[in-house]
């Protein structure tokens, strides 16, 4: 039950402000400005909902469990409250959740025995292409399998505290490691499949949290995953988080983008 709750709250909007001077995703730091130019803030109406990644001037990827209506996105943002020179606002014309993802988990807020969170990936088609600048850039899809032990970076505007939700204005980054899927299988009763990646720190203290869903997992400089689900409280020892394994979906993403220019 706690895992399902976190899976849902990872994609809920910001409601609280971070205390002054605190700069953590969970155990992270303020990202250097414009160091993550592919990072996207996905909004439901006017409320931040999830993270996302710009993979083409007209396409953003995020988590399928962020599925909603009336999306809009911000590109080139570091601080969500300030006017910034590279910031670009775009509306979304259409969303494409992966057909293999079980949307009933989200719609019914329940999970039947045997269900899992496989295929937690969605494409968002922008009404107007992004302008590529120093602050807004695309990142390539992976071409090779990630290696266990790789140093990874994940980012987002999610909660900086593990239970009492407090949200930063500035984009947060945290360095973690890619772990074997067996680590996550051992940590959770929920099924961890071959279309998922396991990443975090077994000692705890560094993790994604509420609001980070759909954001990037970049390992050794390569986009390899999208934030999907984890435990609550965030950042607990022996409870790494789970990410969608993008290399398993490159053919599907390219097909959708080609058929919907």
From Swiss-Prot:
Peptidase S1 domain mapped to chain residues: 25-258
Any Pfam family the entry gives: Trypsin
The name this protein goes by in its record: Prostatic glandular kallikrein-6
Task performed by this protein: Glandular kallikreins cleave Met-Lys and Arg-Ser bonds in kininogen to release Lys-bradykinin.
GO BP terms in the entry: regulation of systemic arterial blood pressure; zymogen activation
Residues bearing carbohydrate: 108
Alphabetical list of SUPFAM superfamilies matching this protein: Trypsin-like serine proteases (SSF50494)
Alphabetized GO MF terms: serine-type endopeptidase activity
Active site: 65, 120, 213
Superkingdom of the organism of origin: Eukaryota
Disulphide bonds in the chain: 31-173, 50-66, 152-219, 184-198, 209-234
Gene it is expressed from: Klk6
Cross-referenced InterPro entries: Peptidase_S1_PA, Peptidase_S1_PA_chymotrypsin, Peptidase_S1A, Trypsin_dom, TRYPSIN_HIS, TRYPSIN_SER
EC number(s) given by UniProt: 3.4.21.35
Propeptide span(s): 19-24
């Amino acid at each position: 039950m706690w895992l399902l709750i976190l899976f849902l709250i990872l994609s809920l909007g910001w409601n609280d402000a971070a205390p002054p001077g605190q700069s953590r995703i969970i155990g992270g730091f303020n990202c250097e400005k414009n160091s993550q130019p592919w990072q996207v803030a996905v909004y439901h109406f006017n409320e931040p909902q999830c993270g996302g990644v710009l993979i083409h001037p007209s396409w953003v990827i995020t988590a399928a469990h962020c599925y909603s209506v009336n999306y809009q996105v911000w590109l080139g943002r570091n601080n969500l409250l300030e006017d910034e020179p590279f910031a670009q606002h775009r509306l979304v014309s259409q969303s494409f959740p992966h057909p293999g993802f079980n949307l009933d988990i989200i719609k019914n807020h329940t999970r039947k025995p045997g269900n899992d969170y496989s295929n937690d990936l969605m494409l968002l088609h922008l009404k107007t292409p992004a302008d590529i600048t120093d602050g807004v850039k695309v990142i390539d899809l992976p071409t090779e399998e990630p290696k266990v032990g790789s140093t990874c970076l994940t980012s987002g505007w999610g909660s900086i505290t593990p239970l009492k939700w407090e949200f930063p204005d500035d984009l947060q980054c945290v360095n973690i490691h890619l772990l074997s899927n067996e680590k996550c299988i051992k940590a959770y009763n929920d099924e961890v499949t071959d279309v998922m990646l396991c990443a975090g720190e077994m000692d705890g203290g560094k993790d994604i949290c509420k609001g980070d869903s759909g954001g990037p997992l970049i390992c050794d400089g390569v986009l390899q995953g999208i934030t999907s689900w984890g435990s609550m409280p965030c950042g607990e020892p022996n409870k790494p988080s789970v990410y969608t394994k993008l290399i398993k979906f490159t053919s599907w993403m390219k097909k959708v983008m080609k058929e919907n220019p």
